[in-house]
């Protein structure tokens, strides 16, 4: 399906069941999902989605991921209150990566930072470039 879409004109559509069936889920039934703030373009985080998480996200408009460590659905913000509302969902050209354009409430990272990408790496090493907005102990009511 995705090879055919390379030559498709804008406005070309495919039904959701056909798209979901054509997605190249990995051996664990997952696809990488990148969350991006819809209005600024800031990359917030990368997580995983299985089919159930993707369908729930599309159905409800509230982002749901799949937690590999817990082996269960992870509804973003369920314990922290820092929810992601789906604005738009895109697929890359191969259909093997999801881009979720979201409206993020508060920090996206479990460390209390706005983005999980707060470590800059260059030829000299790693530098932390962002401070937490919220103490993680407060964020998760520990």
Swiss-Prot record:
GO biological process, one term: L-histidine biosynthetic process
Swiss-Prot/TrEMBL catalytic activity: 1-(5-phospho-beta-D-ribosyl)-5'-AMP + H2O = 1-(5-phospho-beta-D-ribosyl)-5-[(5-phospho-beta-D-ribosylamino)methylideneamino]imidazole-4-carboxamide
GO molecular function terms noted in the UniProt entry: magnesium ion binding; phosphoribosyl-AMP cyclohydrolase activity; zinc ion binding
EC number: 3.5.4.19
Keyword Magnesium: yes
Top EC class of this enzyme: hydrolase
Pathway(s) of this molecule: Amino-acid biosynthesis; L-histidine biosynthesis; L-histidine from 5-phospho-alpha-D-ribose 1-diphosphate: step 3/9
Highest taxon above the source species: Bacteria
Binding site for Zn(2+): 93, 109, 116
Any matching Pfam family: PRA-CH
CC cofactor: Mg(2+); Zn(2+)
Record's cofactor remark: Binds 1 Mg(2+) ion per subunit.
Keywords recorded for this protein, A-Z: Amino-acid biosynthesis, Cytoplasm, Histidine biosynthesis, Hydrolase, Magnesium, Metal-binding, Zinc
Cellular component terms per the entry's GO annotation: cytoplasm
Sequence positions that bind Mg(2+): 92, 94, 96
Role, per record: Catalyzes the hydrolysis of the adenine ring of phosphoribosyl-AMP.
Family: Belongs to the PRA-CH family.
HAMAP family membership: HisI
Assembly information from the UniProt record: Homodimer.
UniProt protein name: Phosphoribosyl-AMP cyclohydrolase
Organism field: Alkalilimnicola ehrlichii (strain ATCC BAA-1101 / DSM 17681 / MLHE-1)
UniProt lineage: Bacteria, Pseudomonadati, Pseudomonadota, Gammaproteobacteria, Chromatiales
